[in-house]
Amino acid sequence: MTTPPRGTAAPPTGDALEAPGPLLMLLETRAPWEAAAMVAASPWLARLPRGDGHPVVVFPGLGASDITTLPLRRFLRRRGYSPYAWNLGFNLGPRPGVLDNCRSLVQQAAHRHGERVSLIGWSLGGIYAREIAKEQPQHARCVITLGTPFAGHPRATNAWRFYQKVSGQVMHDEAMLEQLRMAPACPTTSIYSRSDGVVAWPCSLNPDAAHTENVEIQASHLGMGMNPLALYAIADRLAQDPASWRRFDIHGARRWFYKVPVRAPRPVVAAAA
């Protein structure tokens, strides 16, 4: 196993990886404060570099709809990008037709703008973003996920029962889980929080590769898409030229807000209960 960077601890694996406990779940009540912080941070966020107008498709989390990603999409539009909602109502899992519609949306955005598309996914939406980028590498500019559990067993989250109920799917196929762990070929960023009350944070760690990274912030799972630190990192990542992509720089004042990145040396898997 690769030694983790100095100042970090290796993430728990196997039986040690469990869903967040009651205290972290209680901390999810801070989400409204993160929305308020987004408003308060507007002058700071307005100083970020303008975007180049390229299309950005945003996928909502499990049980959520485009309403939850509206603040993020408004932020992206103000920064000069061309954001797209997924327009499929509530995200109740990859039920029949859902992924086909997502694929079509990305293709249409790419053709309309004549350039590749950045894909942003919150929680389960990040799974869609990653998988579509793998299927359509010719259309994917970059992938950014927010609290997405792509690297661990579904039972290392507090949403797995709800997922099974609304989607009608049981995720115990090891081949499928292995597929989810693989990063897309394009630059791929995972924004995660150790205080996430829904997803065990090691489930959101990209394995170490030249085109992957993990950016740690202090955020709730439910408020991550409105958290000013997440928005800042998203804008920074979208402004990167894929041809000369570099990992998120946490030198200077950023060290006060972002943690030393952790890169998983190997896929993180929890034993099924």
Where are these regions (language model features)?
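Phosphate-binding glycine-rich loops and adjacent basic patches that engage nucleotide phosphates
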Residues: 30-39, 60-69, 189-200
